[in-house]
């Protein structure tokens, strides 16, 4: 039985450096790429393209770091998670590295393409209804080590290596824009970046149609938000008390991006910068481009992933600006 990391966990600089050492050679140290504006480089906005990771998203960082620290006896049993997207694919990829079995519990409304994406990593797939999934999360079987992506604070260490790399590679950074869904990515980046440069501002970004953290921070309490049909569907997550406290402690604020701005950012990244980003990945650039330079200064945008449906991408590229 694996005991979850306590919700009081706040990684130190040493924790982030240890995580960086563990993931070296597995996760790519992604470069900081100047944003290209119509074939001219904009040195004031740098892109951190996590979509070039082996599984197409940043999640390999936190997942590998978590699995690597499991007791070998427990790890050999196998690993499991609840996810229809990047988390399950990252866990399947990492399980193959360690040579252990893996399982993905996927909601029955997930598109077949996402189910197949996890199956390609050799995962055992269990399709469940939402009530069944909630029961599984509350009482996971002991046959596999269960990674609860909604509550495992140990993910902060691995995800935070992004913030470490940003400040090591661009120490003059003034502002980092990062998507905020569950909260572990944005808070991990903030904790690591501020450990090296306390004055750096880290701004989380929500979609206007799914403003969970934005509204909850405004009201100073959890504000339930109905799931929305947003291009940034990968960060269409509910806000919990623990995660609201974490985000409030670590981020300098959360801003909103409209669907039009997200769409424009996806198109701009693909056409001008040759980078394919999902909506949740492009949302950081959408926010940065909507913020005057005087307010943001030297900027880094974390592009968290590239898992976008090809047909959706095609529609965006064909649509008018």
Residue locations for each model-derived region?
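PLP-dependent amino-acid enzyme catalytic core
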Residues: 1-321
């Amino acid at each position: 039985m694996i005991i979850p990391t306590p919700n009081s966990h706040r990684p130190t600089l040493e924790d982030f450096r240890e995580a960086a050492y563990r993931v070296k050679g597995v996760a790519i140290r992604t470069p900081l790429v100047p944003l290209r504006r119509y074939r001219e480089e904009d040195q004031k906005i740098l892109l951190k393209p996590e979509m070039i990771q082996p599984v197409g998203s940043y999640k390999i960082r936190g997942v590998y770091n978590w699995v690597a620290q499991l007791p070998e006896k427990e790890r050999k049993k196998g690993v499991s998670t609840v996810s229809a997207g990047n988390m399950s694919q990252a866990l399947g990829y990492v399980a193959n590295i360690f040579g252990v079995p893996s399982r993905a519990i996927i909601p029955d409304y997930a598109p077949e393409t996402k189910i197949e994406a996890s199956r390609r990593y050799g995962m055992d797939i269990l399709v469940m209804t939402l009530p069944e999934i909630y029961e599984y999360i509350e009482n996971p079987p002991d046959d596999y080590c269960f990674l609860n992506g909604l509550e495992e604070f140990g993910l902060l260490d691995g995800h935070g290596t992004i913030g470490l790399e940003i400040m090591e590679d661009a120490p003059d950074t003034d502002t980092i824009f990062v998507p905020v869904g569950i909260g572990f990515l944005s808070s991990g980046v903030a904790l690591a970046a501020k450990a090296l440069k306390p004055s750096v501002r880290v701004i989380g970004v929500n979609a206007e149609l799914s403003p969970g953290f934005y509204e909850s921070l405004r009201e100073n309490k959890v504000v339930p938000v109905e799931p929305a049909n947003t291009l940034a569907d990968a960060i269409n997550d509910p806000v919990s008390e623990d995660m609201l406290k974490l985000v409030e402690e670590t981020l300098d604020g959360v801003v909103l991006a409209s669907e039009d701005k997200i769409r424009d950012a996806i198109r701009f990244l693909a056409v001008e910068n040759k980078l394919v980003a999902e909506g949740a990945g492009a949302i950081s650039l959408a926010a940065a481009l909507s913020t005057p330079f005087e307010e943001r200064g030297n900027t880094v945008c974390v592009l968290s992933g590239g898992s976008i449906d090809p047909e959706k991408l095609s529609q965006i590229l064909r649509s008018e600006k």
